[in-house]
């Protein structure tokens, strides 16, 4: 009896060994448990159930944190970055992209091999071989063309064979995507892309997980594993940008009175699912101006009162979808309980559009699929309206005279006026004539009266044409104006000419005074007889004779001019 029990235990253990050894995709990729009805309702075209067995011999499974991950790649670890264009409207496509980030100084070349980058320093000593992994040449490359048992390793984890490569284009990475209890396997290079349709997916956040393997001889080893959350919604994903001309900060949702606000609706539709759908916009600005309905995604609105207003926008469109059951069973169309409130993401007001049982799903599958379902998108914001600076104008520009002119410096006075609130600061930006390249920026606090009249003095370096930008601001607004200013050149010779003119005038005046003095002196001079000056005459005669002898060598030609006066004494 004991031997019989031992045999039975042995048989049970032997029968259980294959079950324990055989791994499934859900054991490798994720441990989320999905109910059977979710698996049936969230079927993805081209995807397989994660209940399939995983070929652990060809694709080994490593637990997170094992030391083997460190040696899975030459020169460091490979990181995988997973992104998606979530959120996605039900019925549209959502795309996932995986990009591999190699260790420093490594990249993928045109043939799919991993090589070292040139002129890139690495912590490791680079060998003479430029390849990190050379998959183009070698014995493994011949297996792609071999259909015998030697190429049996060219298959996915579930045993399906690899697709035939086109030409010499090879893919050396295996990507396995997993979500909603299903998986999709694909070959790729350093990047892989997968798109799925969300027509049958459950609304709400979901998880996408990806594991990446690389070629390693006749097997594959994991190099990276990553997951990301994506969202499926039955609301139209929208975002509204609000802009106002003189608003200082549009992100705080505080705007100015008596200036139009520009509203622009952005619909997140990367798969262009709504391209052929008519979209209507219902605007309610909360200031008792009524409801505006338009087919344009932009609109301007001006608030004329200060205060806080609730802005509401509703976007509506009709999209293709499954038709509702024509005769829903009374047992399935139960009314909601009073304690449960409808979700704000509910886009279809009719409860018959929501599948409530397996039977209604079957009727929907066999019914005509040319129905359209209304989808809605909502945006709400609290807008605050305050007073602000509405307008700035330059009314006068004047040159400031400088006592000592400098050729490289000119001063200009600007008279600036504004409308609206009183500014607390003024900024001046001096730029080139195109108003593109700023040369000088000066900001300073200002104290302005109720008339908002401001005088600003600014210096300019050299002559030429400048673009001057004046900005007046307070806590909520920022108004500006610009003008082109021409600065004339300074005449460096004008001071010298002024000094020379003054000196010449003074010289002429001195000569005139001297001449008048001489004339007056001669006119009023007292007469003195010659006889009383005998001594002086004798002395004068001796001096005259001396001068005559001194001039004789230089003026011989003039001796005959006065022959009768030679050797004769002077007589007056």
From Swiss-Prot:
Record protein name field: Transmembrane glycoprotein NMB
Positions of region (Disordered): 321-359
Organism lineage string: Eukaryota, Metazoa, Chordata, Craniata, Vertebrata
Residue ranges occupied by any PKD domain in the UniProt entry: 251-338
Cytoplasmic side: 522-572
Extracellular face of the membrane: 23-500
Residue spans of biased composition, Low complexity class: 330-356
Keyword Signal: yes
Chain positions carrying an annotated carbohydrate: 93, 134, 200, 249, 275, 296, 300, 306, 312, 461, 469
């Amino acid at each position: 009896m004991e031997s019989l029990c031992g045999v039975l235990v042995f048989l049970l253990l032997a029968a259980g060994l294959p079950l324990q050894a055989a791994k499934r995709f859900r054991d490798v990729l994720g441990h989320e448990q999905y109910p059977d009805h979710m698996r049936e309702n969230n079927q993805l075209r081209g995807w397989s159930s994660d209940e399939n067995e995983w070929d652990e011999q060809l694709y080994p499974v490593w637990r997170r944190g094992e030391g083997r991950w460190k040696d899975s790649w030459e020169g460091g670890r490979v990181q995988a970055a997973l992104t998606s264009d979530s959120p996605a409207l039900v019925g549209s496509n959502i795309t996932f992209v995986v990009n591999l980030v190699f260790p420093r100084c490594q990249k993928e070349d045109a043939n799919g091999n991993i090589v070292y980058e040139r002129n890139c320093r690495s912590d490791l000593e680079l060998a003479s071989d430029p390849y990190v992994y050379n998959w183009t040449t070698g014995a493994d490359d011949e297996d792609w063309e071999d259909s015998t048992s030697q190429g049996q390793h060219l298959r996915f984890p579930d045993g399906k064979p690899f697709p035939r490569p086109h030409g010499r284009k090879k893919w050396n990475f295996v990507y396995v995507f997993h979500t909603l209890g299903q998986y999709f396997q694909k070959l790729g290079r350093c990047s892989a892309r997968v798109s799925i349709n969300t027509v049958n997916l459950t609304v709400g956040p979901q998880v996408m997980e990806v594991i990446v393997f690389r070629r390693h001889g006749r097997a594959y080893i994991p190099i990276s594993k990553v997951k990301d959350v994506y969202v499926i919604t039955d609301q139209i994903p929208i975002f509204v940008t609000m802009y106002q001309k003189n608003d200082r900060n549009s992100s705080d949702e505080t705007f100015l009175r008596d200036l139009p606000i520009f509203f622009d609706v952005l619909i997140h539709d990367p798969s262009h699912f709504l391209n052929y759908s008519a979209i209507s916009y219902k605007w309610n600005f909360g200031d008792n101006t009524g409801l505006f309905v338009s087919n344009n995604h932009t609109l301007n609105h001006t608030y004329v009162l200060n205060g806080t207003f609730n802005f509401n926008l509703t976007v509506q469109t009709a999209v293709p979808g499954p038709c509702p059951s024509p005769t829903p069973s009374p047992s399935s169309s139960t009314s909601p309980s009073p304690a449960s409130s409808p979700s704000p993401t509910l886009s279809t007001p009719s409860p018959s559009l929501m599948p409530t049982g397996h039977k209604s799903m079957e009727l929907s599958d066999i019914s005509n699929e040319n129905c359209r379902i209304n989808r809605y998108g909502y945006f709400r914001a609290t807008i605050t309206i305050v007073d602000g600076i509405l307008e700035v104008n330059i009314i006068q520009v004047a040159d400031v005279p400088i006592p000592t002119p400098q050729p490289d410096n000119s001063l200009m006075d600007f008279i600036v006026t504004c409308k609206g609130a009183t500014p607390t600061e003024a900024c001046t930006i001096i730029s080139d004539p195109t108003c593109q390249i700023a040369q000088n920026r000066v900001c300073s606090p200002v104290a302005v009266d109720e008339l908002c009249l401001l005088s600003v003095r600014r210096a300019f370096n050299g002559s030429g044409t400048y673009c001057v930008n004046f900005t007046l601001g307070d806590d909520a607004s920022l108004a500006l104006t610009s003008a082109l200013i021409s600065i004339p050149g300074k005449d460096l010779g004008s001071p010298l000419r002024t000094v020379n003119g003054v000196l010449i005038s003074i010289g002429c005046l001195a000569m005139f005074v001297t001449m008048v003095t001489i004339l007056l002196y001669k006119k009023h001079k007292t007469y003195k007889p010659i006889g009383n000056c005998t001594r002086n005459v004798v002395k004068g005669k001796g001096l005259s004779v001396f001068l005559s002898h001194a001039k004789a060598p230089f003026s011989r030609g003039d001796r005959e001019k006065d022959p009768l006066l030679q050797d004769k004494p002077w007589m007056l």
